[in-house]
Amino acid sequence: MKRLFIGIPIQSETALQLAIRWSNDGLLNLNRMAWTKARNWHITLFFLGATPGSEIAILEQLIGDSFHKVSQFTTRLNGVEVFPEKGKPKVLWLGVENLQPLVAAYEQLGDLLRANGFLSDAKPLVPHLTLARIKSIQNSTSLELLLNEYQSFNFGTVDISRITLFESTSTTAGVMYEPLFEKWLLKA
């Protein structure tokens, strides 16, 4: 069994520089956070979980069928937020402004994944880039200040060029996301 998800790889130099600064900031270090390595940055479209390796070819076909007419585009990373709520945060994330060019393909893929038994229910797409998983909060003031200061901060643009089937593997060096299949979007 492989732990799989479908997502969009993301690179942002502005977000990387701020994440490095925040992770080195004494105030934020009072809170226990596991920072996501920049090489693992992505927007999750669908989390599939434990999946037999024999199903990968089917997933490749479903992804290809769903996204074959979608063109590459640029979108913007805006604002810092937390899941599930500010009072009990578990995830620190950046918002993604607009994935509208691929929403129809996303919905089609969701329908195909459900029809083929990969997903049980439809979940709304909340496009975001996870910066850190919050283990515990010892200084809620520092986190609140960060959220207030960066709630509408423009982190710049990112190119959306491919949809990727990832395998998530836990190693002694941390979690690694290995691309198993990439569907490149059409050149704009």
Over which residues does each language-model region extend?
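Histidine-dependent nucleotide/RNA phosphoesterase domain, centered on the 2H-phosphoesterase fold
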Residues: 1-188
